[in-house]
Amino acid sequence: MTLILYYHPFSSYCHKAMMALYEKELEFQPFLIDLGNERSRTEFAAIWPYAKFPVLHDISAGVTLPEATIIAEYAAGLSTAGPRLIPEKPDEARSIRLYDRLLDNYLHTPLQKIVGDRLRPAGERDARGVAEARATLATTYKLLESRLTDSGWMAGDDFSLADCAAAPPLFYLSRVAPLAGHPRLMRYLKRVMERPSFRRCLDAARPFRHFFPADAADEGWPDEDMRVAF
């Protein structure tokens, strides 16, 4: 089995897929895509017309899969190593998939709105859209804070797809929309940052941190207090 992951090391959605692959102890060949390079972008668009990463290509199976959630679920079915990621019981699996949708739609999407808006020319900024994104985050933080425990993972006692979906956006959000006032969420981020699968993602991302469009009001990156110097 030969897996190729088309990705960028700084992408939070790529981290989601990478965490799943690492957790399932699946070896893969990383293929870095530079969307700022016309040739790289054109070649990638030939694989997936939307030119959005991650995309996983399983050479042995002849399968090409876009979308981080789909890749994570595929990884979960390829290996019995590590956590299941998706529970076997239908009702438990449905709960995990609901968390995955919640985290993508109400954490990841607002994150992309806030960060993406900073890349626009000054005259094209969307202040209203950013405010709406921050309001969505406030609701999501409150919801997650009410559901998290002090020792478990995002969706219960077992590490799952929900954690692969939660860790990457929370890491970046801790800078642009701080978690202060949500102690359980802060402790969760600290806990998941110690997870080897996520630490590998952060290690790969570190050389590219200058890509992040910083703002004077931003918090610093999570630091040694969380045992990761980014």
Named regions from a protein language model:
Residues 29, 83, 156, 200-201:
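A local structural micro-motif
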Residues 99, 103-196, 203, 230:
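GST-like fold's C-terminal all-alpha helical module
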Residues 25, 114-119, 182, 207-208, ...:
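Juxtamembrane/interface motifs at transmembrane-helix termini
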